[in-house]
């Protein structure tokens, strides 16, 4: 009789753990799609204040199309800082989406750019390759960020705080 009660207790514990995990997943999913009302310029300025801007230049809409295959007209706002030289790997792309349905399209474009850059530096640009390995793509609701920098983690933290 005691074994049955102990078995029920373990089963109940497992059940509650599963319920807690499901709730945590749901909350995390909802928070990830939270639309931010943060001003784009404020977020951009916060992010770029943490980056080494001496190694980057501002990208035009044409450059965004060329490097990412994205049409800037599809988004509320989009801005790119990319390497000044072919040997640079520092890069920041910030996008404010018109609709969160575009998250996967933007993520795919960012992943493609990262892969292209890693292929470019594979075998000879070890410093740049390592930087790209640490680069991050972060999507939070209506904002998307791609960052490749020496201090990527710090820039991402600043981005998330600015939202």
Give short role names for the model-derived ranges.
Residues 2-91, 97-163:
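Soluble, non-membrane globular domain cores that form compact, hydrophobic packing
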